[in-house]
Curated annotation (Swiss-Prot):
Coiled-coil segments: none
GO terms classed as biological process: tRNA metabolic process; tRNA methylation
Locations listed in the record: Cytoplasm
Major subcellular location class: cytoplasm
Function (record text): S-adenosyl-L-methionine-dependent methyltransferase that mediates N(3)-methylcytidine modification of residue 32 of the tRNA anticodon loop of tRNA(Thr)(UGU) and tRNA(Arg)(CCU).
Location of N-acetylalanine modifications: A2
Keywords: Acetylation, Cytoplasm, Methyltransferase, Phosphoprotein, S-adenosyl-L-methionine, Transferase, tRNA processing
Taxonomic source organism: Homo sapiens (Human)
The name this protein goes by in its record: tRNA N(3)-cytidine methyltransferase METTL2B
Modified residues (Phosphothreonine): T154
EC number: 2.1.1.-
Reaction(s) this enzyme catalyzes, per UniProt: cytidine(32) in tRNA(Thr) + S-adenosyl-L-methionine = N(3)-methylcytidine(32) in tRNA(Thr) + S-adenosyl-L-homocysteine + H(+); cytidine(32) in tRNA(Arg)(CCU) + S-adenosyl-L-methionine = N(3)-methylcytidine(32) in tRNA(Arg)(CCU) + S-adenosyl-L-homocysteine + H(+)
Length: 378
């Protein structure tokens, strides 16, 4: 979608897709010639059918007692997810450097372009399959849940990591990565499918990457990964909705905050405060990069009655939850937190299963929001 564009370029250039988004379906007869098509416009009938489907699967809501359980024990459901799948569920997100060149700003863009061309098929496949637990969760959960009972339980690192964070006195002079010149935080890092590609690709000696997840199992998998380098990365357990827990960095210290399919797992009523807190961590000119589910994505349409928690907010069969956004909702969240829009676009893709002759309509939203630079008077 968005590629690198000159500083000060018109905002419309930020929404112009330069590398991805170039395969258009002009002849419906060719739909099964490729695995995916970009910028697929929906007909009025298709949009109306999607709206009806959502109305149908939203009629019956999850009882309040279960909703409380899903909220209180959210970290346990995600721990179970990572105990089952470990680091085998998601693929490394190498496509991020095409979508978000801000993650490797000092890298030669021609070098990144050459790398992309050499690995185009692999990168495109990973991007086409990019998702949260989403569509195949139900099937995998059914066949994998029993295996969880037989796995060797490893001690959680949550208490250990949380204690280390609480022992840190967060100040402007001394904190993990305090000597770095470019700092990135990924919230909801999972097992490192974003963090490790960043560390591998961005060789800036001044780079330091923070990553957090409220699943202690996920953080343990990050810390025990052979690619984990404490001199360049700090992984910690954190619940972005817990206002009592502080981040291990001072306010105004981060250049980039990454939210990839994570905000959608938060209860809608808690989203604004979470974004407000993250916004305060950004330097002036710092940026939030987000990619998440859009309204009427196929994953939303596939939910059954009885899985809806509230409007456009659902629970999966394994207890993890997901919200489906509109562009306007995300814009309100970020601008209310004092950030300015750089990019807010809908990625409508038609994915194709050529073997089964199936078409699948995906809807994702990608955003970039920037913290305003300080004025000379301030």
């Amino acid at each position: 979608m968005a590629g690198s564009y000159p500083e000060g370029a018109p905002a419309i250039l930020a929404d112009k897709r330069q590398q991805f988004g170039s395969r258009f379906l002009s002849d419906p007869a060719r739909v099964f010639h490729h695995n995916a098509w970009d910028n697929v416009e929906w007909s009025e009938e298709q949009a109306a059918a999607a709206e009806r489907k959502v109305q149908e699967n939203s009629i019956q809501r999850v009882c309040q007692e279960k909703q409380v359980d899903y909220e209180i024990n959210a970290h346990k459901y995600w721990n179970d997810f990572y105990k089952i799948h470990e680091n085998g569920f998601f693929k490394d997100r190498h496509w991020l450097f095409t979508e978000f060149p801000e993650l490797a700003p000092s890298q030669n863009q021609n070098h990144l372009k050459d790398w992309f061309l050499e690995n185009k098929s692999e990168v495109c496949e990973c991007r086409n399959n990019e998702d949260g637990p989403g569509l195949i969760m139900e099937e995998q959960h059914k066949c994998s849940s029993k295996s969880l009972e037989h796995k060797t339980q490893t001690p959680p690192v949550e208490e250990n990591v949380t204690q280390k964070i609480s022992d840190l006195e967060i100040c402007a002079d001394e904190f993990p990565g305090s000597s770095a010149t470019y700092r990135i935080l990924e919230v909801g890092c999972g097992v490192g499918n974003t963090v490790f590609p960043i560390l591998q690709t961005n060789n800036d000696p001044g780079l330091f990457v923070y990553c957090c997840d409220f699943s202690s199992t996920a953080i343990e998998l990050v810390q025990t990964n052979s690619e984990y380098d404490p001199s360049r990365c700090f992984a910690f357990v954190h619940d972005l909705c817990d206002e009592e827990k502080s981040y291990p960095v001072p306010k105004g210290s981060l250049d980039i905050i990454i939210l990839i399919f994570v905000l959608s797992a938060v209860v809608p009523d808690k989203m604004q405060k979470a974004i407000n807190r993250l916004s305060r961590l950004l330097k002036p000119g710092g940026m939030v990069l987000l990619r998440d589910y859009g309204r009427y994505d196929m994953a939303q349409l596939r939910f059954k009655k009885g899985q809806c928690l509230s409007g456009n907010f659902y629970v999966r069969g394994d207890g993890t939850r997901v919200y489906f956004f509109t562009q306007e909702e995300l814009d309100t969240l970020f601008t209310t937190a004092g950030l300015e829009k750089v990019q807010n676009l809908v990625d409508r893709r038609l994915q194709v299963n050529r073997g089964k002759q199936l078409t699948m309509y995906r809807v994702w939203i990608q955003c970039k929001y920037c913290k305003p630079l300080l004025s000379s008077t301030s």
